[in-house]
Amino acid sequence: MLGDNALFASAYGNVGSSIYYALGLVAALALGLTPVVFILTGALFYFTATTYAEATAMYPEAGGSSLFARQAFNEFWSFFTAWAQMLNYVITIAISAFFAAHYAGGVSWDYFSTSPGDIVFGVALIALLALVNVRGVKDAVSVNIVLAVIDFMSQLALVLAGLFLVFNPEVLSQNMSFLGTAPTWKDFLIAIPLGTVAYTGIETISNMAGEAKEEAKTIPASIKRVMIAVFAIYFTLPWIALSALPVRCGGDGSCTTLLGVPKEDGGYASDPILGIVENMALGPLQGAAEVYVAVLAVTILVAATNAGVLGVSRLTYSMGIHRQMPDSLRRLHPHFRTPYIGILVFSALACVALLPGQAEFLGLIYAFGAMLSFSMAHLALIRLRVTEPDVPRPYRSPGRLRVRGHDLPPLAVLGVLGTLLSFGVISALNVSVAAAGSGWLLLGMLLYVVYRRRQGLDLVSTHKVAIPEPVVDHEAEYDSVLVPVSDGYDEHVMATATKLAARKRRGIHVVSFVTVPHALPISAPLPDEEAAAQSVLEQARIQGGRRVSGHLERIRPGQAGRRIVEEASDMRAAAIVLALPQRIDGASLFGKTLETVLAERPCRVVIESTPPPAATVKRRRAIERAGAAP
C-alpha cells in the first residue's frame, strides 16, 4: 500500500519531468512573457488538481477522469475521456523520449542532439521500454521517491543559484514590454494551452488510488504536496531562465530568446535547463554542473517515458475490462501476464508520432488531449455535485457556489471554462493540430461503435467483464493465485485456490509442468505427457471457469521449484497453492520442489494437504526413476 510520500513521488516524477522540455516549447512562442504563461497555466493546474482530489477521494479506484465520467455520465463519455487520456500517454512517451535524446547529446555525442539522431534515439528508447514492460516491471517506490527528491532539490538549487548569479528585474521588465508584437497575440494565446504540457502526470495519483493507504487522507495530501512543489519551481525558474537568456530583438523587428531557438541555430529549445546552466558563471563547477544536469534530465525523462508506457498498459487493460476496446488489445501475455498487444500497439503509435521530429506539434497535440480530459473531469465533478450530493466526500474542492439549490465547486467551474477556452484556442489557431486530434477522436469513436455493436452492446451502458465475487468472505483474499501442477489434476488444490482468489477473471493461473528427462532434448516430442498436462489445464478451467488461465511449461527433473518462484515473481502473484508432497521411499519429486519454494518464496505459500491418489504416487516413482538417469 502506498502512502503520502510514494504517491507524491510518483506524481512529481511525471509532473517534474516536463519542465525539462516545456520551458523551451513555451519560450519559443511566449518569449518574455513565458513566466506569465506558466502562472496562468499554474492556475489551471490548481483548479484541475482540486477537482481530481475531490473526485478521486470519492471514488478511490484507478481510472482518473475516465472513471469520473462513468460515474457522472455514461460509458460512452467514459470511453471518450479514456481515449483522450490514451492520446496523452502516447504523446508523453514520444515527447519524453525525444527530449531525453537531446539532453544525452548535450554532453555526449552531438548526433543525438539533431535530426535524425534524436529520432533514432527516441524510437530505440521507446522500443526498449515497450519490451521491458511486456516482460513486466514493478514500480520501484523507493526509487521513485529518491528520484523525485533529487529532481526537486536540484531544480530548487538551480533557482537559488540563479537568484544570486543571473536574476535581473530590469532585463525581465524589458522582456515583457513587447506584447502584441513579440510575442504576437496569436503566439501568446497558443503558448497558454501549450504550457499545460508542463503538468503532465496529474492523472498519476488518481490511477494509483486503488493502491493508496487510507486513500481519503493520502490522496488529497499527496496532491497538495505536488501543487506546492510544482508552484515552487514553475513560478520561479522561468524568471531565472529569461534573465540568463533574455529576449533580443534584431534590426528587422524580430525578437527571440535562445531559450526557444533550435540547437541548429545556436539555441537551447531542445535542452532549456542545460542552457540555463551553461549561461551561469559557476566557475570551476561549470563543467560538472552541466554534466550533472544532463544526466539527471536523461534519467528523469527516461523514467517519464517508462511511466507513459506503464500508463498505456494500465489504461489498455482498464478499457478492455469495461468493454471499451477489443479484447485482443488487453490480452495478457501467456507467460509475463501483461497486456502485451496494447503495449506494443500504442508504443508503436508513439514512435510514429515521434518520426516528424516536431516537438512543438507534439506539445500542442498533448494539450489537445489534456484539455479534453481535464474538461471532462471538471464537468463530471460539477454533475456529481448535482446528482450525487450525499455521497461522502473526504475532500471537497475549496469554495462554494450555490446555483438553483445546488452546491457547485467554483474552482471546477473556473477550470472547465479555462480548459474549454484553451481547447478552442488550439483548435482554431492551429489547423494541423485540430485535424490530427480530431482524427484520433473519430478513429476511437468508430472503433468503439463497431466493437460495441459486434458485442451486442449499446453505447452508453456499463458492461464490465464478469468478475465473480469471492467464494467466501471470511477467507484471506489475494489479487492473483499461482497453481503449479506436475502430478496430475487435484481438485482440492484448485478449490483452495478458488477460495483465495479475489479477482476471478484471470485471478488464478495454472502452470502445468511437463518434465523432460535429461536423456532427451528439452524440445523433444512427448505427446502423452503434453496431452496429460493440457488435460490439467482444461479440468482447471472447467472447475474455475473463466477466472482461470494457464500454460504448459517444459522443465528438467528438479527444476520445478525454481520455475515456480520465477513464475510467481513474473506474474506478481500474491499466493502460491501447492499440494503437500508425499514421501515415497524416503524421497519425493515435490519434496525438493516445496523446499525450494518455501526457501525463496516471493509471496505467501498455501499447502493443500489432501493425499494424492495411488495412480499419482505410481507416476511419481516413474518420474523419479527417469530423472535419476544421467
Can you annotate each of these PLM segments?
Residues Y12-L23, E61, T81-A101, L194-A212, ...:
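Membrane-helix boundary/coupling elements in multi-pass transport proteins
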